[in-house]
Amino acid sequence: MKKYFSRALINDILYVFFDTPDSDINIFNEEAVTQLEAHLDFSLAFRAIVFCSKKKTFIAGADVKEIANAYDAPDERINEIVSKGHEIFNRIEDLEIPTLSIINGAAMGGGLELALACTGRVVADDDSIQMSLPETKLGILPAWGGTTRLPRLIGADNAIDLICSGRSVRPQEALSLGLVDAVVPVKDGENLKDLRYGELSNLVEAAIPALEEELEKRRSQKCSPLKLSMIESMMTFKLAKAMISKKAGKNYPAPLKALSVIESCRKMSRDEALEAEKVAFCELVKTPTSKSLIEIFFGERKLKATAQELASKVSMPQSVGVLGAGTMGAGIALCLANKANLPVILYDISEEQLHSAVSSAKSYLDGKLSKGYITSDEASRVLSLIKTTTDVNEATSKPDLIIEAVPEIMELKRDLVYNCDSSKFVATNTSTFKVDDIAGYSTFGGMHFFNPVSKMPLVEIVAGEHTSDETIGVLCKVALAMGKTPVVCKDCSGFIVNRLLMPYLIEFDKMLAEGYDFVHIDEVMKNYGWPMGPAELCDLVGLDIIYHGSESMSKAYDYVELAEESTCTYLYKKNALGQKSGAGFYNWSGTKKGSKFADCGPRKEVPQEIQERLMAPMREEAARILDEGIVNHPYEINMSMVFGAGFPPFKGGLLASEEFSNS
């Protein structure tokens, strides 16, 4: 039997080290839970128990494969697994000696729930450490005491925020919330897992006296009903329900269910609350939404695993040149500096454009600063990494990776790319042209970001006919460092996302020519699950981009037929380009959508017919992409559309089986 734990006894304190076999991270699976229980026997022989990690993470959470299996498992089996976790964590909480979690890395889901059951928690002062209860992102809720203990520890409003959003907190925020008792200084590059026993013992010995003194008080706090006045309770839960309903909507039941559990359990004892938590988990884990969101989780993990494998064989560039300081170039430069910590030389022929790019970066960082997400020193560091220039040679001669992000003009892109040293790695951010039509050498490939760069997680990494594996590896490595999810594909017009979106928008244009009401269509597709309908999407992307994209699609693929009387073309030629011009299908005041601007047909059909008509061309194009080997797996298409186009995650993806049963 493989061991998940080791232990050591130092000065009558038992140290239990989590060390998941054959894994880079620690995870809680059924075997780990069973083995953990054995380490709690004879606990009264010790002064305290300390939970530590032998890996760079503390505990990354429950094994999602086991959660996925619960969808088809009998209710009794799910009850058994959840109850086992409750039983063991209750044993930890009820010990007559203090318990301490030393959080040296990510503590997520069941890992954080273990820490919550302990008397105390300390975390390394490392801003890369994330602590979270992300279960609602998988369509479930924290089932090993998270909805019970966290509100009692940090307050209902803070717990609702963390549980219902699934967001992570860093060490300093965790300290301010009361989630941890102390933040332990560490040197750059160090991890608490590497402490010698003597150093570890000193850290623990300093913490234990206070935990011994407050043992009963702390346990009572987590086992007793929440202390909220009637007014506090009404305000907290009423406001939270309104906010969560608006954000999550009807298609994502987990956040509201988690809120309901927290609210209903506020007057219960610990054991009563845990029972309610278990019942809610068993309901959610059987929903199609949970199954779909778990499929998304695995799909993303597969994409990142592929990219990480390619990236592991190459070195990280030391600096990057970005050509073009427009919306995309400015966003790419900021993300490189902010997320990847890479020096950037941002080039543009316009001083005004460069100034605008830097101002935009500063505004973005000021927003993060005002919310407490970063410090002023961190904001200054990011800005110091971005250097601007109007000298193209400076931007192309010094960096060892160059990303071209100028407007979609073939001659301009070709000129800039061909002026780059072919011994350097060069990527184009084109959205409409084939990579091979711009250039064809081994160090050149595609790196297609989506707007806005700061928010959109997908990057299409495009291999042209001559692009080397090393180049693809470098582009993947940089994308991962930027916090993106790369999908590697072969070269074709539109790549994956735009090639799939254009048939959808072309079909929409044809429906307008037949007299359909675009406002009605927008509502129907939003009800389907899209964040916006096709008319609003055209306005946000820009009718000029839609026009050129449609033309490009029809030239590249002879089976594509455009609308004979195109509303999109009509608006484009009237310079009604959407949000950027103030009017398109709708009137716009900045980023606020107003009344309809374009003429609207009277025709309305049954929503299901409209949805199927618009989605069918997209699915047909997806089949062609697979047949052509642009990508090889349906999950690559599913993830591309979810992360690059906003396809509704609760449906599992464009080609997911649940897409039809959930609609």
Segments from the language model and where they lie:
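Conserved CoA-thioester-binding segment of acyl-CoA-metabolizing enzymes
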Residues: 1-52, 76, 83, 90
